[in-house]
C-alpha cells in the first residue's frame, strides 16, 4: 500500500474526528447566524451561544447538535484528497526547485488555490448540512421539512435542479479562498518556528496541536463575515435572494448592521482548538497503527501533513 494512500486514509480518520468533535459548535454557529431578526418588543430567538445550546438540547435533545453531520462525514476523505492536491499544485506552480522552501506568501497562494478546489466538492455538503442544522423540532410551519441528507438532495433538485444544490458557490469561494490562504501560511510558518533550526527539525505533539489550533483561529478570523452570508444564502427559501450574496449583504447591513456579519464568532473560536486537536489525534493514531503493524513504508508523520482548515 503506497504512503500516499496511507496518508490519505489517516487524513480521513483525522478529518472524521474533527467533524465529530466540532459539529455541535458548528450547529450552534449556523443557528445563531441564520436566526431571524426579532420584531419590535420581541426577544431574539437565542441570546447567545450558551442559550442556543440550552434551548436546542431542551427542545430537541442532545443529538440535535449533530444534525446534518452525515454530509461532512461522508465528504471528509475526498475533501482531504482535493485539499492536499490543491496545496501540492499550488506549491509546484511556484517552485523553481523541488527542495525549495516556500515563503509565507507562497504558502498563502497555495492555500488559496486549494480553497478553490475544495469549494467544488464542499458546496453541496455545506448546503445539505446547513438546511438540516437550522431545521428545528416543531417547526413544520416554517418551511420545507427534510427527513435526512438524501431527502434534502431530492427536494432541492426538484425545486431548482443542480443549481439549487450548488447554491452558495460564490459565497463559499469568498469564504474559503482567504481562509485557506491564512490557514496554510500560518500553519507552515508556526511549524517552522516551533521546530527550531537545523537539518533535523522536529515538532513535538504539543507544538503540532498549538500550530494547528492557532492556524484554525487565523482561518476563521478572516472568513466569518463570508460564512454568515453563505449560511443565510444557503438556508433561505427558494427565490428570496435572486442576486445571490449581494442581496444577502444588503439585507444584513440594512436591517442588522455590520456587527451581524460576525454572528457565531464565539462558537467558531471555541471549536478551533478541540477540533484541530481531534484531527491530529486521529491522524497520529492511524499513522502509528500503520507503523506498528508494518503496513506500507514510512507514512509521513503529521508534522508534514496539513490538516483541512474546514472540517465541514
Curated annotation (Swiss-Prot):
Q: Spell out the protein name for this chain.
A: Protein dif-1
Biological process, per Gene Ontology: carnitine transmembrane transport; mitochondrial ADP transmembrane transport; mitochondrial ATP transmembrane transport; mitochondrial transport
- Could you confirm whether the keyword Transport appears in this record? yes
The UniProt family comment states: Belongs to the mitochondrial carrier (TC 2.A.29) family.
One GO cellular component this record assigns the protein to is: mitochondrial inner membrane
Role, per record: Seems to play a role in the maintenance of tissue differentiation in the developing embryo, but not for its initiation.
PROSITE patterns recorded for this chain?
Answer: SOLCAR (PS50920)
Q: Where in the cell is it found?
A: Mitochondrion inner membrane
InterPro entries for this protein: ADT_euk_type (IPR002113), Mitochondrial_Carrier (IPR050567), Mitochondrial_sb/sol_carrier (IPR018108), Mt_carrier_dom_sf (IPR023395)
Spell out where the chain crosses the membrane: 5-25, 69-89, 104-124, 172-192, 209-229, 261-282
Q: What is the lineage of its organism?
A: Eukaryota, Metazoa, Ecdysozoa, Nematoda, Chromadorea
Disulfide-bonded cysteine pairs: these are none
Q: Which GO MF terms are attached to this record?
A: ATP:ADP antiporter activity; O-acyl-L-carnitine transmembrane transporter activity
Q: Which residue ranges contain the repeat Solcar?
A: 2-93, 102-193, 203-289
Bilayer topology annotation: Multi-pass membrane protein
Amino acid at each position: 500500500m503506497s504512503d500516499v494512500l496511507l496518508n490519505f486514509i489517516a487524513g480521513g480518520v483525522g478529518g472524521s474526528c474533527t467533524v465529530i468533535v466540532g459539529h455541535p459548535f458548528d450547529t450552534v454557529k449556523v443557528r445563531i447566524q441564520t436566526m431571524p431578526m426579532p420584531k419590535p418588543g420581541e426577544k431574539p430567538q437565542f441570546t447567545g451561544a450558551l442559550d442556543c445550546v440550552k434551548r436546542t438540547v431542551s427542545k430537541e435533545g442532545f443529538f440535535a447538535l449533530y444534525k446534518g453531520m452525515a454530509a461532512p462525514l461522508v465528504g471528509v476523505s475526498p475533501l482531504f484528497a482535493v485539499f492536499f492536491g490543491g496545496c501540492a499544485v499550488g506549491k509546484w506552480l511556484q517552485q523553481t526547485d523541488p527542495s525549495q522552501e516556500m515563503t509565507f506568501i507562497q504558502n498563502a497562494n497555495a492555500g488559496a488555490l486549494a480553497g478553490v478546489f475544495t469549494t467544488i466538492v464542499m458546496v453541496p455538503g455545506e448546503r445539505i448540512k446547513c438546511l438540516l442544522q437550522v431545521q428545528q423540532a416543531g417547526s413544520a410551519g416554517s418551511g420545507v421539512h427534510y427527513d435526512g441528507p438524501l431527502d434534502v438532495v431530492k427536494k432541492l433538485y426538484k425545486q431548482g435542479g443542480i443549481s439549487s444544490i450548488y447554491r452558495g458557490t460564490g459565497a463559499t469561494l469568498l469564504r474559503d479562498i482567504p481562509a485557506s490562504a491564512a490557514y496554510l501560511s500560518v500553519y507552515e510558518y508556526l511549524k517552522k518556528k516551533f521546530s527550531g533550526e537545523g537539518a533535523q527539525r522536529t515538532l513535538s505533539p504539543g507544538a503540532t496541536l498549538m500550530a494547528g489550533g492557532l492556524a484554525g483561529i487565523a482561518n476563521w478570523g478572516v472568513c466569518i463575515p463570508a460564512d454568515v452570508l453563505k449560511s443565510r444564502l444557503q438556508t433561505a427559501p427558494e427565490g428570496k435572494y435572486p442576486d445571490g450574496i449581494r442581496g444577502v449583504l444588503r439585507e444584513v447591513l440594512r436591517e442588522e448592521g455590520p456587527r451581524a456579519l460576525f454572528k457565531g464568532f464565539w462558537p467558531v473560536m471555541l471549536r478551533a482548538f478541540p477540533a484541530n486537536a481531534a484531527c491530529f489525534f486521529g491522524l497520529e493514531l492511524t499513522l502509528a497503527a500503520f507503523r506498528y503493524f508494518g503496513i506500507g513504508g514510512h507514512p509521513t508523520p503529521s508534522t508534514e501533513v496539513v490538516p483541512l482548515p474546514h472540517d465541514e
